[in-house]
Structure formats: C-alpha cells, structure tokens
C-alpha cells in the first residue's frame, strides 16, 4: 500500500469544516478538483464522484463507498477499479482541533497490482490536486 498525505491549518472550528466537507452536493461550489459528488454522507453510502481534468473538463467518474464516518472527526471512502486486487483508492479526511482552529489531514491510500505501474503518475499528480482542494476548502471555511 502506498500513501500520499497532505495537511493544512484552517482558522475555523472542526464542526464548520465538517459541515462543508459532508455537504457533498455543494462540493462543486468550492472544490476545483472534485466537481461533483452525489449521495448521502453516511456510513455505507455509495457516492457518485466526478473529478476534473487539467483542461477543466470531467476526467474521471467513480463510485466510492463510505467506509468510515465519525462526525465531526473523519471520514473515509473506498473506490476500486474493476476489482479490488487490481487497484483500490481510499480517501481519508481527518479533522483535529488545534486551539480555535483545525488541522486538516488529507490522505490517499493506493493498493493493488496496478499501483507499481501507476505510482510515478500518482506520486507526482496527486499531491498538487490535494493541495488545491485543501486550499479551496480553507478559503471557503475561513471566508464565511
């Protein structure tokens, strides 16, 4: 299993950030990477997710399942390509209260037989996407 991890400090309480990140239907209003998410923000729910490509057009659609949901601390979803043993991606967002603000820890885990073949792309391409998403979330949470 390979992991990519990013962190950001946000000057807003975890509860406020939680309300933004679990309002999946409004991700498109602030998220430059994940342009559409539909589904219920609850344990076991299957979501429909569309990610944006470099050209700003829809690049990838997938259907992750929420495998962990601990309000207002963390959630995790899992998506697989064809079969789990080929390629699985887990996204985890954790919120830690730090003073009057929050540390957001954003992780992506990759496993399966395809990961060694894709790692060069994942290791270079995913961190900037996570940073862009984190920065946009910070701006939204600190603005309102």
Predicted regions mapped to residue ranges:
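A solvent-exposed, acidic/Ser-Thr-rich amphipathic alpha-helical stretch
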Residues: 37-47
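Hydrophobic pocket/interface hotspot
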Residues: 16-21, 27, 47-49, 66, ...
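Hydrophobic ligand-binding cavity/cleft-lining segments
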Residues: 1-38
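A conserved amphipathic terminal alpha-helix motif
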Residues: 103-105, 109-144
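Hydrophobic-ligand binding "helix-grip"
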Residues: 38, 55-103, 109-112
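Hydrophobic-ligand-binding modules of eukaryotic lipid transfer/binding families
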Residues: 1-9, 15, 49, 98, ...
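Residues at helix-coil transition
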Residues: 22, 71, 142-143
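Short aromatic-glycine motifs in intrinsically disordered, low-complexity regions
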Residues: 49-55
